[in-house]
From Swiss-Prot:
Taxonomy of the source species: Eukaryota, Metazoa, Chordata, Craniata, Vertebrata
Name of the protein described by the UniProt record: Cardiolipin synthase (CMP-forming)
Entry EC number(s): 2.7.8.41
Region: Disordered, residue numbers: 65-84
Organism: Rattus norvegicus
Transmembrane segments: 109-129, 133-153, 190-212, 250-270, 271-289
Amino acid sequence: MLAWRVARGAWGSLRVAVRPPGARLGRGGSRRALLPPAACCLGCLAERWRLRPAAFALRLPGTSPRTHCSGAGKAAPEPAAGGDAAAQAPSARWVRASATSSYENPWTIPNLLSMTRIGLAPVLGYLILEEDFNVALGVFALAGLTDLLDGFIARNWANQKSALGSALDPLADKVLISILYISLTYADLIPVPLTYMIISRDVMLIAAVFYVRYRTLPTPRTLAKYFNPCYATARLKPTFISKVNTAVQLILVAASLAAPVFNYADSIYLQILWCCTAFTTAASAYSYYHYGRKTVQVIKGK
């Protein structure tokens, strides 16, 4: 009986110690305040499960919740001088600063527009294979509009710019261009060697992006952290000739789509555009080979 009373008293003291001042653990009350914030995506959920002690630790009095993707919330208070410094040390929260400060919100308007462009790519490929070039021209114009909008929004609104967007925007362009060139080559509107050159360059660039992601990821490197879109490690900056090359490639796509509609598939100007596209593609590949390291900006503190 005495042992039971001692155990009950110790449990009551422990509950009071972890309870914020003035809070009562009633039904649906401050218990919810002690829970960690909800994960915004599957990547955050997987990373939080890997770091369970940090994700499910109780918040200390005087601190506010910190969302993983936006990095919002106030930092922990500075430890007081003297004997209280050890009690207020950051290690009491079980949170790794490098893990929480690396997160950003991936759900921005430019990123959604880039994903929309990726979704339109197979639709365009199907329309070209079905030789429905009139509708394909309209869908291609819509895809081009999303490309213009995401760049305009990211440049003019700072909260819409993200490290993920710096990689997702060119990736969407490469997916769209690759599917369009393969489909147009199948329809005998673009020569095979030109398509092979463009696809080879894009495959090498995509492989380089995955390699940069691996190299800039802090240890320990895990699959959950690698494929987490909220975890930003580097920003990619395309070269000037690469931007020119993308514009020339899209002009060739538009001209090739319109060729069957306006009956100029055998025009000499279209063949000149083939040569210009081949030149800019080769020059773009060389620019990335020569200035490769300058196109990658590693985010500080990662």
